[in-house]
UniProtKB/Swiss-Prot annotation:
Residues 135-145, 245-258, 266-281, 293-307 have a biased composition (Low complexity). It comes from Dictyostelium discoideum. One of its GO terms (molecular function) is guanyl-nucleotide exchange factor activity. PROSITE patterns: RASGEF, RASGEF_CAT, RASGEF_NTER. This is Ras guanine nucleotide exchange factor S. It comes from the Eukaryota. One of its GO terms (cellular component) is plasma membrane.
C-alpha cells in the first residue's frame, strides 16, 4: 500500500492505562504520520532507534489532540464500532516540532470528520431523491476502485508494508504541495460554535473558483476540548487564516485544569483568556514538513513583534465575503468581540475562572505576571515573571547521545507542571476548607477529582524527568512511580483509618466505638479542626517545595540531575502521605459533624418541654457517681473537708472538691489553680458546670441567712470567671449554651447580680469572638512569597544558601509557635501515650512529630550528598546550626539535631566524621555532654534551670516526668469510712497537685516569646521536611561508605 509521510518527529510514546501514563518504550523513537495514496486514511507509526516498530495505529475519525504541556501532547481515539477509548501521549524531544505535529494531526482529524459528514449527507440525499438513486446504480456499474489506476506519487514517498517498514527522514516540499493543491474550500470544517452564522461584508456572491488553494498549515484547529488552542486572525489579499498554536501560559489555563471542571460560563471565559507567551509565528507548510531549523527568520521576528492582543482571543474567521445573509445575535456578538479586541491597550488583564480557582494574567509590554486567586480569596504563594526571550533561549537541540536526558530539554513542560501542581494543591486545600465550613459526609467527588489531578501532574512529571539509575536513592523513584501508577486508594484517603503509624492523630474507628455523648464529639471536632489546619499547611508547603524543585530543575542550574529527581521522589511521597492524612481527617470531621447534628435533632425533639432537665442529663455520664447532688452529699459528710497542712494525701469526691472550692469561710488561690488545671482528669467541663450550678442554688434547709447565701453564690461566680479567663478552650458549644442560660436567669433575678452577669456575659462574648478569629487564622493563607526567576531556590539547595544563624532563628520561631499552644489538659491521663487517645493531645503530637521529622531531615540532607567534600561541609554547617540553637535556648530543635547526627546511618560515617573541623567536633562534644542520660539527664536539667527566657524546653523529658507521676500514683483511693461507702471511690488530689506543679514548671516558658522576624521563603520551607525512613537512610549510608 503506497503511503506518504506527512511529518516525522522525535519523541517518547506513552499510553494511559486505568487513568495513568506508562511508557510504551523507554527509548526515543521516530514517530511519523502516514497518509494513504489511495484513500484519505492516516496512521501513526513509530520506529525505535534499533529499527523496531513499537507503535502502529490508524488515526480514527473520533480523535482528539490536547496539549498537556509545551512538550507533551495527549491523543484520545474512540472506536466508532466498539466505543473503546484509547489514550496515547507524545513526549517531544524538540520543542519546535510540537506545534507542527499538532497542526498536522489536527488536519488529519478534520479530513476524516469531513469525509464522514459528506458520506452521511450523501446517504440521506440518496434515500430521498430517486434520480440520485439511479445515478448511484450507474456509478455501481463502474469498475471497482481497486482496479482504477493509482494516482501519481512522489519519488520521496515512503513505502510501508507488512514485510518492510521504511520511513523517510525528509519529505519533498514540491510533492506535498501538489498533493495539497487539490484541497478546496469544501474540505474545510464549519465555523467554530461561537460563530454560528455568516458575517457579510458586501453584497457580491462569493466566487469559489477565485480562491487560492488551501494548504495544511492554513486549516483551523480542532474543536475546543479540554485544552483550547488560541488563534489569531489576520486578513490580507483575500481570505487568509493563520492559526497560532500557542503553548500554555505560565500560571494560566492548563491542559490539566484545576478541579472541579469549569462551568459553561467559565469555559467561555477560558476561550478568551490569555494563552501564551510564545512569540513564534504560525507554522507554514515549509516549516511543517522540512527538517528542524533553529535560525529565526525575519518573518518570525515580525510575528513576534505583532500586537499582543491577538494572542489572547480565539480567532473567528471573517466570513463577510461569503454571501448576503442577515446578521444574527451571534454575528453581532462576534462584531462586539472584534471591536473590544481593537480597543485593548498595551496593558492587558485577562481572568480565567473555574468553579474554585481564578487565574489572573497581567501583561505589560513584553513581560507578563500571573497569580492564582482561589474561591477563599487566597492568592498563590508564588509570583512568576516571564519574558518572551525565555522561549527563544529554551529552544535546544539534542544529539542522540543526549537522548536519554530528554527531561532536561522539557523546560516549559516542567515549568507548566510546576505551576499546575501548585495550583491544584491550593485548589485541594480550598475544597477541604469548604468541607470544614459546610461538612458533607458523603460528598467526596470534588476532593477525589482534585486528588486525581495532582496524581496526573506528578505522573507526567516523572515521565518527563526520566530515571536516576546511578544514584543511591534511585529505588525511591521506582517506589514512587509505582505508587502513582496505582493511583489514590479510597481506603487510604477517604476511610479515616490509621495511616503512617505514629503520625496519625485521629481514628474514625475509635470515634465510632468509644465516643459517647455530644460533649466528647464536640471536643473531637475542635481537635480535628486544629489537625486539619496543620495538615493543610503541610500539604501547601510540600506542594510549593515540589513545585519550586521542578521549576529550579527546569532551568538546568545543576549538573546533579539524578539527585534532584530523587529529591522530587521524596517530596512526592511526603506530599501523598500528607494528603492522605488531610483527607482522612476531613472525612472524620464530616462524620463527627453529622453525628453531632443527629444527636441534637434527637434531643431537640425529645426535650421540647423539659429543656433544662434534658441539658443536665445530656452532660452527665450515668456510669459515674457524680449523679449525686452536691447538697445531698453534704448531708452525709456533715462538714466540708479542708486542704491538709502537713502535706498528706487529700482524698475527696468531686462534690467535696466543689464545696471546698466555693467555701464561704476560706479561699485558697493555689487550690483553685490546681483544680481548674487538672479537673479534666476526673470530670468533664459539662459535669463541673452542673456542680457549680447545684452549689449556686442554696437550699433553705442549709441556710436562710442572706449574707451566707450571697457569699457562696459570689464564690461560684468567681470560680466561673477564673475558669472562663484561663481555660477558655474547655467550653464547647453545648456548655456555652448552658452558661448563657445561667447568665440570663442571673440578670433577671432580683438578687443584685446584674453587674456580675454583665461581666460574665462580656467574658463569654470575648471568648467566642477570640475563638472565631483563631478559627479564621487557622485556615488563612500567609502572605504570598514573590520570587524572581533568578532567585528561585531548590529546597535541596536551601541548606547551603542560607546562613546557620538564619536557619536556627526560623526553626526557633516555628517551634515556639507550636509550643505556645500547648494546654494542660493534653498532659492528663497520659493521652499522648495511648494510640486511640492521641487526638486529645494535638500540640504534643505536633511537637514530637516536628522534632522527629527534623532528626530524619538532618540525616537525609547529609546522606543525599554523594561527594565526601560537600558532605563534610554539610555536617559542619549542621554543627554550626546547633551552636546557634544552644544560644537561643531552643532545646527542642537542638535535641532533634543531636538525635539526627547520632542516627546509626550518620554515626557510622567514620570517613566523613574523621575530616570534621575542630570547632565542629567541640560542638558535638558539648551536645553530647548536655544531653547525657546519666542521673536522669541531670546536665540538661541543671542547664535548663539557669537559662534566661525566652526558651523552648525539650518536651520529651517533661513527658517522662509526667509519666512517672501518672504511674506512681493512683487516680482514686477507696474510702475507709463506712458512712461514706455509698459515695464511691475518692479522688487522689495529691496526684493532681504533682501534675499541676509539672505543668507550672513547663508553662512558664510560654510567657516570653522570641523577637525574631520570619524570613521567607526559609520559614515556609522549614515548616515541613521531606524525609526517608530508617532503612532507606541506612541503604544510602552503606552506598556512601560500604562496610
Amino acid at each position: 500500500m503506497g503511503e506518504v509521510s506527512l511529518i516525522g518527529i522525535t519523541a517518547i510514546l506513552c499510553q494511559k492505562t486505568d487513568g495513568f501514563w506508562k511508557n510504551i518504550d523507554d527509548s526515543l523513537c521516530r514517530l511519523e504520520v502516514l497518509k494513504s495514496n489511495i484513500d484519505s486514511k492516516f496512521r501513526l507509526v513509530a520506529i525505535s532507534t534499533d529499527n523496531r516498530c513499537i507503535f502502529n495505529k490508524w488515526v480514527r475519525t473520533n480523535s482528539e489532540i490536547t496539549k498537556c504541556s509545551d512538550l507533551f501532547l495527549e491523543i484520545k481515539q474512540v472506536s466508532s464500532q466498539s466505543s473503546n477509548v484509547e489514550y496515547f501521549g507524545v513526549n517531544f524531544a524538540y520543542k519546535p516540532e510540537v506545534d507542527k505535529f499538532y497542526a498536522c494531526f489536527s488536519k488529519c482529524i478534520e479530513t476524516l470528520q469531513t469525509q464522514r459528514r459528506q458520506s452521511t449527507l450523501n446517504i440521506q440525499a440518496l434515500q430521498i431523491n430517486n434520480e440520485l438513486q439511479q445515478q448511484l446504480q450507474q456509478q455501481q456499474q463502474l469498475p471497482p476502485i481497486d482496479q482504477l489506476p493509482p494516482p501519481p506519487t512522489s519519488t520521496s514517498t515512503s513505502t510501508i508494508s507488512n514485510a518492510n517498514i521504511s520511513i523517510s527522514n525528509s519529505i519533498s516540499y514540491d510533492s506535498l504541495h501538489q498533493m495539497a493543491s487539490g484541497i478546496t474550500l469544501e474540505d474545510l470544517p464549519p465555523p467554530p460554535p461561537s460563530a454560528s452564522s455568516l458575517i457579510l461584508n458586501n453584497n457580491t456572491p462569493l466566487d469559489l473558483t477565485s480562491l487560492p488553494p488551501i494548504d495544511f498549515s492554513n486549516l483551523p484547529p480542532p474543536p475546543t476540548g479540554l485544552m483550547t488552542s488560541r488563534s489569531s486572525l489576520t486578513e490580507a489579499n483575500g481570505l487568509e487564516i493563520k492559526n497560532k498554536l500557542s503553548p500554555l501560559l505560565n500560571g494560566g489555563a492548563s491542559g490539566l485544569s484545576s478541579s472541579p471542571p469549569p462551568t459553561t460560563e467559565s469555559k467561555n471565559q477560558l476561550n478568551s483568556s490569555s494563552g501564551s507567551n510564545n512569540s513564534s509565528s504560525a507554522p507554514h507548510l515549509t516549516d511543517l514538513f522540512l527538517p528542524t531549523n533553529n535560525n529565526n527568520s525575519s518573518g518570525n521576528q515580525s510575528a513576534s513583534n505583532s500586537s499582543p492582543t491577538s494572542q489572547y482571543h480565539q480567532s473567528q474567521p471573517n466570513l463577510q465575503q461569503y454571501g448576503t445573509a442577515p446578521l444574527t445575535a451571534s454575528s453581532k456578538l462576534l462584531q462586539q468581540q472584534q471591536q473590544q479586541q481593537q480597543q485593548q491597550q498595551q496593558n492587558i488583564i485577562m481572568t480565567t475562572t473555574t468553579t474554585t480557582t481564578t487565574t489572573i494574567n497581567i501583561k505589560t509590554g513584553s513581560s507578563s505576571d500571573s497569580f492564582l486567586k482561589t474561591a477563599s480569596g487566597r492568592r498563590s504563594i508564588r509570583v512568576r515573571h516571564s519574558t518572551n526571550q525565555a522561549a527563544d533561549q529554551q529552544k535546544k537541540t539534542m544529539g542522540r547521545k543526549d537522548g536519554l536526558a530528554v527531561s532536561l530539554q522539557n523546560v516549559e513542560g516542567l515549568q507548566n507542571i510546576a505551576e499546575n501542581l501548585e495550583d491544584e494543591t491550593l485548589n485541594l486545600l480550598d475544597l477541604v476548607n469548604e468541607q470544614v465550613v459546610t461538612p458533607e459526609i458523603s460528598n467526596n467527588a470534588h476532593l477525589n477529582q482534585s486528588l486525581m489531578k495532582i496524581f496526573e501532574h506528578l505522573q507526567v512529571l516523572f515521565i518527563l524527568t526520566g530515571q536516576a539509575s546511578t544514584h543511591p536513592g534511585g529505588k525511591l523513584i521506582t517506589q514512587v512511580v509505582n505508587k502513582l501508577g496505582r493511583g489514590p486508594q479510597a481506603s487510604e484517603f477517604f476511610s479515616g483509618k490509621s495511616v503512617d503509624g505514629g503520625y496519625q492523630w485521629y481514628n474514625l474507628d475509635e470515634v465510632k466505638d468509644s465516643v459517647i455523648g455530644i460533649h466528647n464529639l464536640l471536643a473531637l471536632k475542635k481537635n480535628l479542626i486544629t489537625a486539619i489546619a496543620h495538615l493543610s499547611t503541610c500539604v501547601r508547603v510540600l506542594g510549593l517545595q515540589a513545585s519550586l524543585e521542578i521549576d529550579w530543575m527546569s532551568r538546568n542550574k545543576s549538573s546533579e540531575t539524578e539527585k534532584i529527581v530523587v529529591q522530587l521522589a521524596c517530596l512526592t511521597r511526603e506530599l501523598i502521605s500528607s494528603m492522605s492524612r488531610l483527607l482522612a481527617a476531613t472525612v472524620t470531621y464530616c462524620y463527627v459533624c453529622s453525628s453531632i447534628a443527629f444527636i441534637r435533632n434527637q434531643q431537640h425533639s425529645a426535650s421540647a418541654d423539659h429543656n433544662q432537665a434534658s441539658i443536665q442529663n445530656r452532660i452527665r455520664s450515668p456510669s459515674t457517681i457524680d449523679t449525686i447532688n452536691i447538697w445531698d452529699e453534704l448531708k452525709t459528710i456533715k462538714t466540708i473537708p479542708t486542704v491538709p497542712k502537713d502535706g498528706s494525701i487529700l482524698k475527696v469526691t468531686l462534690n467535696q472538691l466543689v464545696l471546698m472550692l466555693t467555701s464561704e469561710t476560706s479561699y485558697d488561690s493555689k487550690f483553685l489553680k490546681t483544680f481548674i488545671t487538672t479537673y479534666q482528669s476526673f470530670a468533664s467541663p459539662g459535669v463541673l458546670f452542673t456542680k457549680l450550678i447545684e452549689r449556686f442554688y442554696v437550699p433553705e434547709w442549709y441556710s436562710t441567712v442572706p449574707t451566707k447565701i450571697s457569699t457562696i453564690q459570689q464564690k461560684v461566680i468567681v470560680v466561673l470567671k477564673y475558669w472562663i479567663e484561663n481555660q477558655s478552650s474547655d467550653f464547647d458549644q453545648d456548655v456555652i449554651d448552658q452558661i448563657y442560660f445561667f447568665i440570663n436567669n442571673l440578670a433577671n433575678s432580683n438578687e443584685g447580680y446584674s453587674e456580675l452577669s454583665r461581666l460574665l456575659r462580656g467574658l463569654l462574648d470575648k471568648m467566642i469572638q477570640d475563638r472565631e478569629v483563631k478559627f479564621e487564622l487557622l485556615f488563612q493563607m500567609p502572605p504570598r512569597i514573590s520570587f524572581e526567576e533568578d532567585s528561585i531556590l531548590s529546597p535541596i539547595e536551601l541548606f547551603s544558601e542560607w546562613s546557620a544563624q538564619s536557619i536556627a532563628q526560623q526553626l526557633t520561631l516555628i517551634d515556639f509557635s507550636i509550643f505556645k499552644d500547648l494546654e494542660a489538659r493534653e498532659l492528663l491521663n497520659q493521652n499522648f501515650n495511648k494510640p486511640k487517645l492521641k487526638y486529645k493531645s494535638p500540640t504534643i503530637m505536633r511537637m514530637i512529630s516536628k522534632s522527629t521529622q527534623f532528626s530524619f531531615w538532618v540525616a537525609y540532607v547529609i546522606l543525599m550528598e554523594p561527594k565526601k567534600e560537600k558532605r563534610i561541609k554539610i555536617f559542619e554547617k549542621f554543627c554550626e546550626v546547633g551552636k546557634y540553637l544552644l544560644k537561643m535556648n531552643n532545646f527542642n530543635s537542638l535535641m532533634g539535631l543531636n538525635a539526627g547526627l547520632n542516627l546509626t546511618c550518620v554515626h557510622r560515617l567514620k570517613k566523613t566524621k574523621k575530616k570534621l573541623s575542630s570547632s565542629a567536633i567541640s560542638i558535638l562534644t558539648e551536645l553530647e555532654r548536655i544531653f547525657s542520660s546519666k542521673k536522669s539527664f541531670k546536665n540538661y536539667r541543671d542547664h535548663l534551670s539557669t537559662v534566661q527566657l525566652p526558651c523552648i524546653p525539650y518536651l520529651g523529658f517533661n513527658l517522662t516526668d509526667i509519666t512517672f507521676i501518672e504511674e506512681g500514683n493512683t487516680d482514686n483511693i477507696s474510702s475507709t469510712d463506712p458512712a461514706a461507702a455509698n459515695i464511691g471511690p475518692l479522688i487522689n488530689f495529691k496526684k493532681r497537685e504533682l501534675l499541676y506543679q509539672a505543668w507550672a514548671d513547663l508553662s512558664r516558658f510560654q510567657e516570653t516569646p522570641y523577637t525574631f522576624q520570619p524570613e521567607e521563603p526559609l520559614n515556609t520551607f522549614l515548616l515541613n521536611f521531606p524525609i526517608l525512613d530508617d532503612k532507606e537512610l541506612y541503604d544510602l549510608s552503606i552506598a556512601l561508605e560500604p562496610k
